[in-house]
C-alpha cells in the first residue's frame, strides 16, 4: 500500500494534523489508530474546558473528540482503527498489523508521528537528573 501521508495516532494531535493536511490540499491520507475509537486521551477527560477557542463553547474531552472525529470523517480520508504500528523505517515504510489485514506494509511519502504519551515516574525513563529538559508530563503541561 502506498500513501502520500500517513499519520500514526488518532488522538487530538493526529486528528488535527489530518484535518490540517486535508485543508492544505493533501488527499491521499491514512490515519492509523491502535484503539477502536479516535480521540486518544480526550476520551478520559470528562471535565469541561475543551473547545472554547476551536468551537466557541466548552466541551468535555469526549465531546471535543467527537467533533474532531466528525471533521475527519467529512474529509473522506482512510482511517484504520485497531491497527498497531510495529515499525517505522528510515525509508518511510511502516510495518503495521490489524485483525483484517494481518501484518502489512505501507510506503509513505511523509509520516506524522502523533502517538501521544503516557506519564511515568522519572526513574522509569532512565534519564539522569531531576527532570529532563523540555519534557513535561500531561499534568504539568495543563
Please state what every model-predicted region is.
Residues 1-8, 66-142:
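FAD-binding core/adjacent interface of flavoenzyme oxidoreductases
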Residues 3-67, 71:
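Beta1-alpha1 glycine-rich phosphate/pyrophosphate-binding loop at the start
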Amino acid at each position: 500500500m502506498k500513501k502520500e501521508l500517513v499519520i500514526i495516532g488518532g488522538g487530538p494531535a493526529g486528528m488535527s494534523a489530518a484535518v490540517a493536511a486535508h485543508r492544505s490540499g493533501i488527499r491521499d491520507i491514512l490515519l492509523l489508530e491502535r484503539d477502536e475509537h479516535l480521540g486518544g486521551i480526550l476520551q478520559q477527560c470528562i471535565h469541561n474546558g475543551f473547545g472554547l477557542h476551536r468551537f466557541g463553547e466548552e466541551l468535555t474531552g469526549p465531546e471535543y473528540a467527537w467533533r474532531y472525529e466528525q471533521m475527519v470523517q467529512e474529509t473522506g480520508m482512510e482511517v484504520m482503527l485497531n491497527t498497531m504500528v510495529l515499525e517505522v523505517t528510515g525509508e518511510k515504510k511502516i510495518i503495521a498489523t490489524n485483525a483484517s489485514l494481518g501484518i502489512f506494509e505501507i510506503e509513505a511519502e511523509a509520516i506524522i508521528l502523533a502517538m501521544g504519551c503516557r506519564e511515568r515516574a522519572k526513574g522509569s525513563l532512565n534519564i539522569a537528573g531531576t527532570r529532563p529538559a523540555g519534557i513535561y508530563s500531561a499534568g504539568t503541561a495543563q
